[in-house]
């Protein structure tokens, strides 16, 4: 994978104090020198079969990192006696676990008990973003896997789609993200879809009024009402690509400026004074958006990580050792 020079320079400049304090680039260069190549090749194969893997892995990485840190706690399967983060409401539709399993199996065959599941998620997400048209960027590695996975943590911590802009900025800010990072991470919705349960109130009964949300384009609201009349309906979060939302670009920001945001928080960032200027910058400059997204992803990947002797290296990403 070709790494763009601007990405390397900016990442070193902006996230060195955050990420490199505990993690390091090329962590597996001696212990498992082919690790990143193995991950990339398997992600490429999956992307060729299903380009929506970009959105799936980005969401998985987000949901893992913001609950107890990037420790692969989201990958743990529940047992008959113990639930896991997979049982949390926000995680019901998280997918991509089979690809992580496939990568882990390949790495265990070549480098047993060496590459953590949390690093696999981070690397696989990076590769999927690039394949989907997003930025290429380097990520430090050396994460270790956690020992705890509870649905209560995810239910309590992960933000709902109707969070306020103030709440969203506070959520990200508590993890070291600024407004540019926060809005850039929401830009991942350029490759996402949402089930009707996350937005149906905006098109049918906004805040109990019996009417659609006035901040939503009325033509879009009508189309979404039809979509949600069918059980199991969903919609592309980027309405510039309503059929195949798999192209990673800044068109999402232009859409929300035209009142075509699907999730409430997406629409709010386009109008709130705290974020609207950033939205305009990203809508006007695709390279700026991609550059900041790369920075934000590396910051996110360093949230509350376990390193050194903390945690473990799972041999099966779905179960503690």
Curated annotation (Swiss-Prot):
Positions contributing to heme b binding: 189
Disulphide linkage map: 32-111, 65-70, 117-317, 196-228
Keywords, ordered alphabetically: Calcium, Disulfide bond, Heme, Hydrogen peroxide, Iron, Metal-binding, Oxidoreductase, Peroxidase, Secreted, Signal
Subcellular location: Secreted
Signal peptide: 1-21
Gene Ontology BP terms: cellular response to hypoxia; hydrogen peroxide catabolic process; response to oxidative stress
Official protein name in the record: Peroxidase 28
Site (Transition state stabilizer): 59
EC top class named in words: oxidoreductase
MF GO annotations: heme binding; lactoperoxidase activity; metal ion binding
Cross-referenced SUPFAM superfamilies: Heme-dependent peroxidases
Note: There are 73 peroxidase genes in A.thaliana.
Species of provenance: Arabidopsis thaliana (Mouse-ear cress)
Record-linked InterPro entries: Haem_peroxidase, Haem_peroxidase_sf, Peroxidase_pln, Secretory_peroxidase
Classification of source organism: Eukaryota, Viridiplantae, Streptophyta, Embryophyta, Tracheophyta
Pfam families in the cross-refs: peroxidase
């Amino acid at each position: 994978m070709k790494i763009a020079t601007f990405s390397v320079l900016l990442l070193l400049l902006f996230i060195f104090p955050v990420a490199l304090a505990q993690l390091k680039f090329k962590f597996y260069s001696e212990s498992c020198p082919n690790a990143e190549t193995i991950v990339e090749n398997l992600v490429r194969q999956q992307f060729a079969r299903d380009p929506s893997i970009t959105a799936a892995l980005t969401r998985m990485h987000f949901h893992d990192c913001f609950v107890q840190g990037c420790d692969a706690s989201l990958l743990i399967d529940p047992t008959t006696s113990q639930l896991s983060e997979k049982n949390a409401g926000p995680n019901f539709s998280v997918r991509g676990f089979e690809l992580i399993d496939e990568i882990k199996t390949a790495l265990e065959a070549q480098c047993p008990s060496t590459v953590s599941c949390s690093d696999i998620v981070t690397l696989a997400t990076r590769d999927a973003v690039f394949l989907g048209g997003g930025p290429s960027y380097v990520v430090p590695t050396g994460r270790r896997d956690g020992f705890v996975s509870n649905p209560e943590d995810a239910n309590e911590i992960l933000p709902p789609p109707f969070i306020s802009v103030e709440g969203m900025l506070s959520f990200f800010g508590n993890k070291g993200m600024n407004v540019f990072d926060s809005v850039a991470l929401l830009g991942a919705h350029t490759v996402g879809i949402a089930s009707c349960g996350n937005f149906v109130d905006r098109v049918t009964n906004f805040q109990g009024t019996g009417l659609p949300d006035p901040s939503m384009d009325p033509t879009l609201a009508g189309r979404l009402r039809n979509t949600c009349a069918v059980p199991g309906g969903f919609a592309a979060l980027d309405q510039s690509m309503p059929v195949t939302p798999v192209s990673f670009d800044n068109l999402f920001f232009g859409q929300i400026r035209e009142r075509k945001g699907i999730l409430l928080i997406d629409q709010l960032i386009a109008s709130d004074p705290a974020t609207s200027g950033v939205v305009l910058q990203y809508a006007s400059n695709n390279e700026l958006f991609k550059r900041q997204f790369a920075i934000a992803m590396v910051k996110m990947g360093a949230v509350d990580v376990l390193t050194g002797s903390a945690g473990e290296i799972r041999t099966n990403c779905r179960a503690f050792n």
